[in-house]
């Protein structure tokens, strides 16, 4: 394995402050060099972080497009230019090339500590399987959603998002900080084991595969006219079947799930997703057998 540099990003969203604090604490205690691998710690969106807002112009975590967006002279959005900088500086062909990117996020939803993957890349599966095996973390596999693209970790050959919640925006929570520190340290340990060919993958891993998103009930003007049903609050990762309540509207009417297919919801009531017209996303559960190819591709870096 020839991984030489790994990028750890916090503050991709400026009002998610706990990952920034965790990295600050962690980097003071731990050397940036770890058995020949250098770790780069960076705030993804420093301007938004300074202002305590999610972003300045557009969502940075939707700004890493595959084509046409990496010309700084063609776009005046702060986040697009910031994405350009991060790729130019730390991308695989950048001045400080990183082979892996880990993006740290918090959520207002009760997601616990979870892993988010984008697509079915072997190297991503390898890291995710090791973390799930160690901590039992749920994995949200996001793929094939044309409405949501341009995620940061997709711009690197390997990358995972670590998502921890629930915690309010711009609110420090030491328990959340401690969880991030634990995950960062464990990632470094697992990557070191991979480098020295000391890992054994679990036989399988369980993933929750993105299927779509559900908007809030809306009135004739398009305004939100319903809230998350009390029975659904804090029930991320819990199965929903036909007839289960989803929303309670302003007239007291319960909006139920009407499909026959079982689903598992994630990001229930995430505050930042209201602007995206998402009350929750939903998934199907899938068991995936581990493959030797995952480790082999890591070794081929």
From Swiss-Prot:
Its cofactor is Zn(2+). It catalyses: an N-acyl-L-aspartate + H2O = a carboxylate + L-aspartate. Keywords: Hydrolase, Metal-binding, Zinc. Binds 1 zinc ion per subunit. Substrate binds at residues 54, 61-62, 163, 273. It comes from the Bacteria. GO terms for molecular function: aspartoacylase activity; hydrolase activity, acting on ester bonds; zinc ion binding. It holds the Pfam family AstE_AspA_hybrid. The keyword Cytoplasm does not apply. Zn(2+) binds at residues 13, 16, 105. Its EC number is 3.5.1.15. GO terms for cellular component: cytosol. It is an enzyme of class 3 (hydrolase). Gene3D superfamilies: 2.20.25.160, Zn peptidases. HAMAP family: Aspartoacylase. Belongs to the AspA/AstE family. Aspartoacylase subfamily. This is Probable aspartoacylase. It comes from Prochlorococcus marinus (strain MIT 9301). The lineage of its organism: Bacteria, Bacillati, Cyanobacteriota, Cyanophyceae, Synechococcales.
């Amino acid at each position: 394995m020839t991984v030489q540099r790994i990028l750890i990003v916090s503050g991709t969203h400026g009002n998610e402050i706990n990952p920034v604090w965790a990295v600050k604490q962690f980097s003071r205690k731990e050397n940036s060099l770890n058995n020949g691998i250098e770790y780069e710690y960076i705030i993804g969106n420093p301007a938004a972080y300074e202002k305590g807002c999610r972003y300045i112009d557009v969502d940075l975590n939707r700004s890493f497009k595959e084509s046409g967006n990496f010309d700084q002279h063609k776009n005046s959005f702060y986040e697009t230019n910031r994405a350009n900088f991060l790729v130019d500086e730390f991308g695989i062909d950048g001045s400080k090339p990183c082979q892996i990117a880990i993006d740290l996020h918090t959520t207002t939803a009760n997601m616990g500590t979870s892993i988010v993957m984008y697509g079915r890349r072997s190297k991503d599966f390898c890291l995710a399987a090791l973390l799930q095996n160690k901590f039992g973390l749920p994995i949200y596999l996001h793929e094939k959603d044309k409405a949501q693209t341009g995620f940061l970790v997709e711009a690197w050959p390997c990358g995972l998002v670590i998502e921890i919640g629930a915690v309010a925006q711009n609110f420090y929570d030491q328990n959340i900080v401690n969880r991030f520190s634990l995950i960062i340290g464990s990632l470094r340990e697992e990557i070191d084991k991979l480098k020295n060919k000391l890992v054994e993958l679990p036989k399988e891993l369980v993933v929750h595969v993105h299927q779509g998103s559900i908007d809030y009930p809306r009135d004739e003007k398009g305004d939100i006219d319903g809230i998350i049903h009390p029975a659904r609050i804090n029930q991320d990762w819990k199965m929903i079947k036909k007839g289960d309540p989803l929303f309670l509207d302003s007239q007291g009417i319960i909006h139920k799930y009407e499909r026959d297919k079982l689903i598992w919801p994630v990001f229930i009531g995430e505050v930042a997703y209201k602007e995206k017209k998402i009350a929750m996303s939903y998934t199907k559960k899938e068991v995936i057998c581990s493959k030797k190819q995952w480790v082999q591709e890591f070794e081929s870096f």
